[in-house]
Curated annotation (Swiss-Prot):
Family stated for the protein in its record: Belongs to the peroxin-13 family.
Protein name per Swiss-Prot or TrEMBL: Peroxisomal membrane protein PEX13
PANTHER family recorded: PEROXISOMAL MEMBRANE PROTEIN PEX13
Record's keyword terms, sorted: Membrane, Peroxisome, Phosphoprotein, Protein transport, SH3 domain, Translocation, Transmembrane, Transmembrane helix, Transport
GO biological process terms on file: cellular response to reactive oxygen species; cerebral cortex cell migration; fatty acid alpha-oxidation; locomotory behavior; microtubule-based peroxisome localization; neuron migration; protein import into peroxisome matrix, docking; protein import into peroxisome matrix, translocation
Length: 403
């Protein structure tokens, strides 16, 4: 039997020589002509750039927004303001749906033929005019809805006044019934006294009783008049109290508010306790509520009690004066730092003790100050959540410390 020829070599079994031409022999037959020798022989590893994480919805987006129509920006609010008065006429009436489709007049196409160029130009040229007319009609419709809502409010107010008057009339009837009961008691009392006088059990006449009752009534009225005359001076004191005390109270309130604002922003410049963070990525602010920073910058963060209720954003300061929001996933929390006020208050007793021996202080002033600075710097970072075997400020699951 004749021996079979050996199989042809595989492409990966042949030795390729750089620069060799195409053919069955060795050579880069699979290489594209667009790839030059510099691309294959370029030394070094490819550089990998750090991609910043996605930014969570901004505060303005989290509060929600309204999708307003392009041609109806000023009149969409009337539907929510006067919807409580529910009018069936405005609910079923749509003056902009008379067979029009996007101001294209809902053409009936014959055999699906495209419209002519003249029709397209006419529609495009008249589109702005019809949009203006639509805006005017919307304005009149909004005014009519406002007048209808005003009429409903006035009518409801009038009905409320009538209901109050009706309740007062009913109250008058009830009072009349009560007073009639009092009159019945007086009549029974009069008959009882008259019976006692006729039987001789009561001495004195009815006239004397009436005079005595009248005298007591006059005495009570005189005492009330004297009390009213003596109490007429209180409006004057009240007037002067309002004139003098009003501005004073306003000034006190404003001064208290300014002090609170100043105290609430002392964390930005390091006077009060704050949290230190390092920027991991660059961030560019897009609104006045945010602040920009670059990777490696040190930021001061407000404490948890002063942080706004915005998910994924933190209140921070870069220069110690301007405060703003930053994305939480763009920074790394380092720890809590004590404010300068707290550090100074704690170092005051030590300074007083050192001043008791002035001769020994002169030689070690610089050394003590440097040691105090280093101690204060190291005591700055306080771990809030200690995890065994994790030197970083992140936990086992990679979550940052809670502010």
């Amino acid at each position: 039997m004749a021996s079979q020829p050996p199989p042809p070599p595989k492409p990966w079994e042949t030795r390729r020589i750089p620069g060799a031409g195409p053919g069955p022999g060795p050579g880069p037959t699979f290489q594209s002509a667009d790839l030059g020798p510099t691309l294959l022989t370029r030394p070094g590893q490819p550089t990998l750039t750090r991609v910043p994480p996605p930014i969570l919805p901004r505060p303005s987006q989290q509060t929600g927004g309204n999708n307003v129509n392009t041609f109806r920006p000023a009149y969409s609010s009337f539907s929510s303001g006067y919807g409580a008065y529910g009018n069936a006429f405005y609910g079923s009436y749509s003056p902009y749906s008379y067979g029009y489709n996007g101001l294209g007049f809902n053409r009936l196409r014959v055999d699906d033929l495209p419209p002519s160029r003249f029709v397209q130009q006419a529609e495009e040229s008249s589109r702005g005019a019809f949009q203006s007319i639509e805006s005017i009609v919307h304005a009149f419709a909004s005014v009519s809805m406002m007048m209808d809502a005003t009429f409903s409010a006035v009518y409801n107010s009038f009905r409320a006044v009538l209901d109050v008057a009706n309740h007062f009339s009913r109250l008058k009837i009830h009072f009349t019934k009560v007073f009639s009961a009092f009159a019945l008691v007086r009549t029974i009392r009069y008959l009882y006294r008259r019976l006692q006088w006729m039987m001789g059990l009561r001495r004195g006449s009815e006239n004397e009783d009436l005079w005595a009752e009248s005298e007591g009534t006059v005495a009570c009225l005189g005492a009330e008049d004297q009390a009213n005359n003596s109490a007429k001076s209180w409006p004057i004191f009240l007037f002067f109290a309002v004139i003098l005390g009003g501005p004073y109270l306003i000034w006190k309130l404003l001064s208290t508010h300014s002090d609170e604002v100043t105290d609430s922003t002392n964390w930005a410049n390091g006077e009060d306790d704050h949290v230190v963070a390092r920027a991991e990525y660059d961030f560019a602010a897009v609104s006045d509520e945010e602040i920009s920073f670059r990777a490696g910058d040190m930021l001061n963060l407000a404490l948890k009690e002063q942080q706004p209720k915005v998910r994924g954003w933190l209140l921070a300061s870069l220069d110690g004066q301007t405060t703003g929001l930053i994305p939480a996933n763009y920074v790394k929390i380092l720890g809590k730092r004590r404010g300068r006020k707290t550090v100074e208050s704690s170092t005051m007793p030590k300074q007083q003790q050192s001043f008791t021996n002035p001769t020994s202080v002169k030689g070690v002033t610089t050394t003590n100050s440097l040691e105090e600075q280093e101690a204060a710097f190291e005591s700055v970072f306080v771990e809030t959540n200690k995890v065994a075997g994790t030197p970083d400020s992140t936990g086992k699951n990679g979550d940052k410390q809670d502010l």
